[in-house]
A protein has these predicted regions:
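Beta-sheet repeat architectures centered on beta-propellers
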Residues: 2-91, 308, 373, 377-513, ...
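N-terminal beta-propeller domains
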Residues: 1-96, 134-186, 239-314, 318, ...
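Autoprocessing Asn-cyclization modules and mimics
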Residues: 95-100, 145-241, 389-399, 477-594, ...
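Short beta-strand elements that form the blades of beta-propeller/WD-repeat-like
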Residues: 76-81, 123-126, 264-267, 311-323, ...
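Catalytic or ion-translocation cores adjacent to nucleophile or general acid/base/metal-coordination motifs
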Residues: 335-372
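Beta-strand-rich solenoidal segments
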Residues: 87-170, 213, 229, 422-423, ...
């Protein structure tokens, strides 16, 4: 005897769930989750929407790392760093500064290890193997890369060398001393170490002896260098109190950089990995610790049983410090200051961060754990009176694959949702975007995955205010091309790498001969024959004519029969302009590729671009047809299960007999049950007046299925690149009552 029951899926706010949760029917996430949630945006109301497509902006010179430049709401720019090069674009894809190579010291391998901090018109770029750089906007449309240099004190100067305001550190063993040929200021002094301490790389670097500075001008041997003494060093020694530049080509450079509490913070110097350095207040190039006054520079190392490499800073209410071995923060005094006297670094959690920079998202700092398999949020807890690092990806860890970049979108002009995007770079799903939707105050959190065309990969991602921009690695016309693309604000753009066509005018058609009248006209100058159902206008009259028959006169001349008589007698050689046609011009970047075409609410199908950069549509269309690449959204429910008084349905054959899908503004939908014999059903609103566009469906649509399955699911997808929103569904399940009793 068969029985049936109904269950309602009111929302999908938990997103895609780990396959290992397939039998966890007891959890709230199971009820509101999905077996697959691919290429959908989770909505604040609980439904899902086909993810927005992208618009093609520009082609990049190679593999690139995008970084945002945001000066204000109106002044933003996309900075693309590639191998020893920088290019800058506005949000429309227009180049502002191109092929900048001066001072671009990063390599392709280092791109996603670079860290950034912006202050006004300047972005500081840090890497442990490279001297720090500054990207400076010198005018509204001009960007350049400059060397980062510590400040100097020209009141102390000898031989053209000024005293430096940089930090110093004793790297050499404490048993090594130095002696001087003379301790007074002057050039050509000899400094001798008691053991090997120098290489030729030390030339043109500062040294500090007894707290007084000198400048190395020559190298003689591992124990002997020539220096210029800038300040009297007290005696000729030997001196055990001597230091080198903290930051140099010898000892490496900082990899963490941030602005906090009106100071520039540097950290994680390669040979001093636990270092935390802060400039003087409001003097961002002055790292002179001086006497330790409240406004002077800060120089310390994070202490612990292990040396923790400082990888990232994040300036929020506190300065958060992320290392490879744990998470720390620098508390503020009651007067909100951080000074050399009160500075402290407090360890909070022990997980460690990858080289991917953290970002603030939904009141917490999201970061990729060092193992690359977990996303955690570093958030303050009043109950614990400290920070905790909660794993937010635990229900969907299969979607996390060593992310190399994070971007946060805090809503846009049309939707309130905020999303965090994690660009995967592992071996399982490289080039995909794990997307996290969270509303902390409502205890809503869910994951999904975004992909693009098969064999194409997302390469870099940033947000600029409400804009989301990506670099995509695409295979186009047999070559690898890196494209700059911008996600749309809504699902109205349903294609990736979208551009619009222009109607091919088929040469330079002109009216052939004066005095023509009636419902036909002879036109010369066609490079391609006109086709029935194409439309055109003639100069001097706005009337649009539809071609109903075509007669070739030989060469480029054709006589066209029209749907109406000529409104006026056209002049000889009057220009003819096609207004609707089959042949359309496209950007050369699509050459020999198969593209999908969408016009308004109608999907026109897939077409292959010719070697001359044209497509031939099956219906005549005006200029402005959207072309691009389709992507497939998939929403599959968790196995429909139920706990009955007689026992659970888990593992028993059952059939989804009916599903009612709540749709909103949907133009295309395919639906099937999990059974192998189930067929895709299509809903598309086709009740429209000839010549008009399709009408989106906002309604509850009912579907019926056959076939039994032990883990039945409902899968929603699309064949055509058109808008789709699913708010929820009601499912009816039929099962054998006798099996429940036997079970």
């Amino acid at each position: 005897m068969a029985r049936s029951l109904k269950t309602v899926i009111t929302n999908f706010s938990a997103g895609e769930l780990n396959p290992l949760l397939a039998t966890r029917t007891d959890t709230p996430a199971y009820i509101n989750g999905a077996k697959q949630c691919r290429n959908f945006s989770l909505l604040a109301e609980g439904g899902v929407m086909r993810r927005p497509g992208t618009t093609y902006l520009a082609s990049l010179p190679g593999e690139s790392r995008l970084i945002p430049f945001v000066f204000s709401d109106d002044e933003i720019a996309i900075i693309a760093l590639s191998n020893n090069r920088m290019d800058v674009y506005n949000i429309s894809g227009t180049a502002l500064s191109s092929n900048v190579t001066t001072n671009c010291n990063w390599t392709t391998a280092q791109l996603f290890e670079l860290n950034f901090a912006q202050f006004g018109d300047t972005i500081f770029v840090a890497h442990r193997d490279n001297p720090t750089r500054k990207i400076f906007r010198s005018s509204a449309t001009t960007f350049e890369v400059q060397e980062f240099e510590f400040g100097t004190d020209d009141s102390v100067s000898v031989g053209g060398v000024d005293k430096s305001q940089q930090p110093f550190f004793k790297y050499a063993a404490g048993t090594i001393s130095v002696s001087l040929s003379a301790n007074t200021t002057g050039t050509g002094r000899t400094l001798t170490a008691s053991a090997n301490a120098f290489t030729s790389d030390y030339v043109n670097q500062y040294i500090e002896v007894n707290g007084k500075q000198g400048f190395i001008t020559g190298y003689t041997s591992p124990t002997v260098v020539t220096i210029t003494i800038l300040e009297d060093m007290g005696s000729t020694g030997p001196h055990f109190d001597w230091k080198e530049q903290t930051i140099s080509s010898v000892n490496g450079f900082p990899q963490a950089v941030s602005f906090h509490n009106n100071r520039l913070w540097l950290g994680g110097v390669k040979n001093r990995p636990a270092s935390v350095l802060a400039s003087r207040i409001s003097e961002y190039f002055n790292f002179d610790v001086g006497s330790g006054a409240a406004d002077e520079a800060i120089d310390l190392d994070i202490s612990g049983s292990e040396v923790n490499e400082v990888r990232h800073f994040l300036s929020v209410k506190d300065l958060q410090i992320f290392t490879d071995g744990g998470e720390y923060y620098v508390p503020r005094a009651t007067d909100n200051t951080i000074t050399p006297a009160n500075v402290a670094v407090l360890r909070q959690t022990p997980y460690g961060i990858s080289r991917t920079a953290p970002l603030l998202f939904d009141q917490a700092s999201g970061f990729v754990q060092k193992n690359g398999k977990s996303i955690r949020e570093f958030v303050y807890s009043d109950i614990e009176d400290g920070y905790k690092s909660t794993a937010v990806s635990i229900l969907a860890e299969h979607l996390i694959d060593s992310p190399k970049q994070i971007a946060v979108l805090k809503g846009n002009a049309t939707r309130p949702e905020q999303y965090a995007f994690f660009l995967n770079n592992g071996t399982t799903s490289p080039g995909t975007l794990a997307i996290f939707h969270s509303v902390r105050d409502e205890k809503i959190a869910g994951w999904g995955l975004w992909t693009t065309r098969t064999n194409d990969l997302f390469q870099s991602i940033i947000s600029l205010n409400e804009h989301l921009v990506v670099c995509v690695k695409r295979q186009l016309n047999g070559s690898t091309v890196y494209t700059l693309e911008k996600f749309a604000d809504t699902d109205s753009i349903t294609l990736d790498m979208k551009l619009t066509t222009t109607l091919n005018q088929k040469g330079t058609p002109l009216v052939q001969g004066a005095g023509q009248s009636g419902a036909s006209v002879t036109i010369d100058g066609f490079s391609t024959a006109p086709v029935i159902n194409e439309s055109f206008t003639i100069a001097g009259n706005a009337t649009e004519y539809l071609i109903q028959a075509v007669t070739s006169n030989g060469g480029t001349s054709f006589t066209l029969n029209l749907d109406k008589s000529l409104a006026a007698t056209p002049a000889d050689n009057a220009a003819v302009t096609l207004t609707k046609g089959f042949l359309h011009n496209v950007n050369t970047i699509y050459r020999n590729e198969q593209v999908n075409c969408v016009d308004g609410n109608s999907s026109l199908g897939a077409f292959t671009v010719s070697g001359t950069d044209t497509i031939t549509l099956t219906t005549p269309r005006a200029t402005g047809v959207h072309i691009g690449f389709n992507f497939i959204p998939i929403l599959e429910t968790m196995p429909i299960d139920k706990e009955l008084a007689e026992g659970p349905l888990t593992g028993l054959p059952r059939r989804i007999s009916r599903a009612i899908i709540d749709l909103n503004s949907t133009l295309d939908l395919t639906i099937k049950a999990a059974d192998k014999t189930a067929k895709s059903l299509v809903v598309q609103q086709v009740t429209f007046t000839g010549g008009s566009d399709l009408n989106p469906v906002t309604a509850k649509k009912e579907f019926f299925f056959l076939g039994y399955d032990k883990s039945p699911t409902v899968t929603l997808s699309q064949d055509d690149p058109l808008p789709m929103k699913v708010l929820g569904m009601s499912v009816e399940v039929v099962f054998a009552w006798v099996l429940i009793q036997l079970h």
